[in-house]
Every structure is written in C-alpha cells, then in structure tokens.
Amino acid sequence: MKPSTEWWRYLAPLAVIAIIALLPVPAGLENHTWLYFAVFTGVIVGLILEPVPGAVVAMVGISIIAILSPWLLFSPEQLAQPGFKFTAKSLSWAVSGFSNSVIWLIFAAFMFGTGYEKTGLGRRIALILVKKMGHRTLFLGYAVMFSELILAPVTPSNSARGAGIIYPIIRNLPPLYQSQPNDSSSRSIGSYIMWMGIVADCVTSAIFLTAMAPNLLLIGLMKSASHATLSWGDWFLGMLPLSILLVLLVPWLAYVLYPPVLKSGDQVPRWAETELQAMGPLCSREKRMLGLMVGALVLWIFGGDYIDAAMVGYSVVALMLLLRIISWDDIVSNKAAWNVFFWLASLITLATGLNNTGFISWFGKLLAGSLSGYSPTMVMVTLIVVFYLLRYFFASATAYTCALAPMMIAAALAMPEIPLPVFCLMVGAAIGLGSILTPYATGPSPIYYGSGYLPTADYWRLGAIFGLIFLVLLVITGLLWMPVVLL
C-alpha cells in the first residue's frame, strides 16, 4: 500500500465521524444516540473503503464506543441508576455479538465447506454433473447450476464456492472446444459457461440462509432490532417457488439471451471422466462427509422445533472431527472462517447498539411519517426496489447489508401492517440476486468478469436484464407466496 495515495482511506471514516458528530442533534434523538450513529456511519465508510480488513474496522469501532460508552452508548438516566457500572455493561455489549447463534451457524457452515474441499467431495459432485450433462451446451449450463445448488447450503462463502470450487473446474471447459479468452472464439461456448457460473452463484446465494454470509448478517440485524428471526427452514420454504423457477429458468434464459455458437460436443464429458478416474472411487471420508451433510440438511429443514440450527452445525463439526474428516488444525488455521466470524459478530454488536440507543425506533418513526398515506404493499415494494437498485453503489455485499438493512428493518418496524418476516426474506433474497447487477458486486464477480469471456458491455447488459427479471419475480413471489408460509 502506498501511503501517498491511500492515506485518504484512513482519514475518510474519521472525517465522516467528526462531521456527523458536529452537526446539530435531530429532534427526538438524545445526544449519545447521535454520537453513536456518527461512529456507526464511520464504520460503514471504513467497510466500503477498507483501509484495513473489515473485521479490523468493526473492532476499532466497537473499541471506540466501549471506551467512550458514557458519552456514546448509555443515556444519562442509565448512568444515574444505582449500581450501574458502565465498564462492565460496555464490555458485555462489546462481546455480545460473539454469543449470537447466527455467528456459530456460519462458522459451522465454513467448516462444512472445509470438509467438502479436503475430501474432494465438492469437486467430485461437480465433475459427475458435468460428465452426465455435458454433451449439450444447454445441459452443461444446468450442470453448473446444479453444482452450485448442491454446494450452496453448506458453503456460506459464495466466493469460496464460486471462485474456489466451480470456477477452477469450468475454466478448463472452453479450451476443449478451442473457445479462447479475449478472442472472437470466446462466444463459441466460453461466454455462456462463464455467465452461467456467476449467475448460478448469485441465484444459489439467495436460495439458502447459509449460502452467503450477508444472509446471516441480515438475520442477526433483524433479531437485534425486533427479537424476531427466520429459521433455516423458514428461509428455504419461503424461497422455494422462486428457487425452483430460477433454477429451471436461468440456464435456458442465458442460452436464449446469450446464445453459444456451439450447441453440443463430447469433449467436456470425456475430460470430466478422465478427471474422475484420476480421483478414484468414492472414498470412506467422502461417504462420511456426504452422510453428515444430508443429516444436517434434514435437521435444518425439519428439526427446527427440536434443535437450533446453530446447534446442528456445532454438533456436525464435532462429528467431523471425531470421524477425522477434518482435523483441529483445519479449524484453527481456517483464516476465512475466523475472519467472517469476527467481522460478522462485530457488525451484529454494532447493530445491536444502534437499536439499544434508540436510533432504529427514531428512524423508523421518521420514515413512517413520510410514508403515511400509502398502502403497506406499495411501501414494501418501493423499499425493496430502492434497496435492490442501491446495489450498484456497493462493491461489498457486507457493507451493503450493514449500511442499508438496518434502515429497511426500521422502516418495516415503524409500519406494523408490513409483515416483518416476509419483508426481511425479500431483503435477504435481494442481497444475493442483486449481486448479478455489476462486475464488482460480490466476490466471484471480478473472477468471472476477468476470465476474458465476458466483455464489459455484455456483462453490464446481461446484469441489467437478469437483475430486472430477478427483481420482478422476487416481488411477485414475495407478495403471493411468502406470506402463506411465513405468517
């Protein structure tokens, strides 16, 4: 990093904090609430600019608030209560996010992904689908979609799933048909395959609660603001019709809107068969991994009344260790899992403070006043559309969720007529589906964009078309189906 060119990334969050803190406190807010909001906004700016890793930004924000808690976190009335010790209370708040069940669910899901990777099961599943369905280009598109679909429930990093598992496999396919990157031959088959790679990643990120870290962040924000939540099964059932529709429609739609020149061939199945032969038969570790994953999915879908989803994940990780699918070193050395663990817990802590200080309720009432006179359905749809389109301005799904989701939740809470579970699920689906809009919206986007098979103009055009289709289908199913299963 060059200090002469990057110093502003460090100063910008501090400048935002100072500017907001110096502004007059809005009517209806207490001084400590406004100062807390100033630091919270500075953290969001830090997450967007990333002068340091996001987890560090969030931890610095928490440290500032906890140290200055008499002026930022607690009201004068709280401080005046007999026996109130702000030092103990601020510490309790600072680490509260780490006890949130959502944090442990996503950490467990990361370990599942490690098991998939170490055993080779994820790669084997993708290769089997490519071998069976790769004779026709359209079916190859479905093979990419189904591969993502199978991996998504237990791979909460869509970057690890899309860029780490799927992309390394499908990037080998176009050259088998002399379809080369940055060449006129790219449209032969490579462009279609690469577009299917990124669009399948975005679709599957919306289908499952554990398919993308920001989904779980949203649930944490929802729980901290309202004490309501969505279980793994709620999310799955609420998304079911839209999921089926998108899984079946998208490969065909891409085939029509971005047609490959080559329609069929045998090179891909032969290559996949060679790779599978090199892997050998299904080993005992893969079988154990497959059995545990099926068991976890069954309990996530049907066991919500008997065991918490996070406890399912925690127990399965313990079994993975006992069965030697993964080792303890795999857990302690998994930098991606610990990184998400820390920033997600920290962001949930910050969002909890935003609610505890009274900002969420104040902002919700402010929005409710400006939206009064409109039907709840119109308000809900308008908020979803605005939230969806604002994706163009964010290069991080985490920053996008943390910056805008609390405001969306506040608006819904301020209008009791808006069904919060339905609204939050629509917001969650919009996070994943909206990632298709730009070549920088989510982790795998730059990987596929930089493959040499997706020209800039094509990516933006297809992103807008597919993004619009996704938004329309989301609104329709959100209004017609989700209330049936969630209310």
From Swiss-Prot:
InterPro entries of this UniProt entry? CitT-rel, SLC13A/DASS
> GO molecular-function annotation terms?
antiporter activity
Localization, per the record, is:
Cell inner membrane
* Membrane topology annotation: Multi-pass membrane protein
So what does this thing catalyse?
Answer: (2R,3R)-tartrate(out) + succinate(in) = (2R,3R)-tartrate(in) + succinate(out)
**Keyword Cell inner membrane in record:** yes
Regions that span the bilayer: 10-30, 33-53, 54-74, 93-113, 137-157, 189-209, 236-256, 292-312, 313-333, 340-360, 370-390, 393-413, 418-438, 465-485
Q: Which GO terms describe its cellular component?
A: plasma membrane
The alphabetical list of record keywords is: Antiport, Cell inner membrane, Cell membrane, Membrane, Transmembrane, Transmembrane helix, Transport
Q: Does the keyword Secreted apply?
A: no
Pfam families linked? Na_sulph_symp (PF00939)
State the protein's purpose: Catalyzes the uptake of tartrate in exchange for intracellular succinate. Essential for anaerobic L-tartrate fermentation.
Please state which protein family the record places this protein in. Answer: Belongs to the SLC13A/DASS transporter (TC 2.A.47) family. DIT1 subfamily.
The name on file for this protein is L-tartrate/succinate antiporter
Write down the species.
Shigella flexneri
